Amino acid sequence: LIRLNYDRRLVFVDGAREVVPGVSVQKVGGHTAGMQIVTVEHAKGRAVVASDASHYYRNFEERIPFNTLHDLPGMYRAFDTIRELASSAELVIPGHDPLVLERLKKVGNGIVEL
């Protein structure tokens, strides 16, 4: 990372930024102060890779924060941001839920398709 930074190939994002066309990162906070989610423009709409902003589907769907977090109000704001950015709840991908492998179409061992 140090070399990439000196080569000006590393970009720190504190907010929102398009990484490549159709893929953006958005700071949401909550779980950690710098927690980010990723949005991906897809044929089905905008998907949100929630990472630790929603560890499990239940966190997002029922607005139940994960038990380890930095900022509780920030976690609820993150849920709101996820809901606003995703085209539908079906396009929200939590960070650690094994149900992802059941809810989405499997295309390989541990690989799913939106």
At which residue positions do the language-model features occur?
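Metallo-beta-lactamase
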Residues: 1-27, 74-89
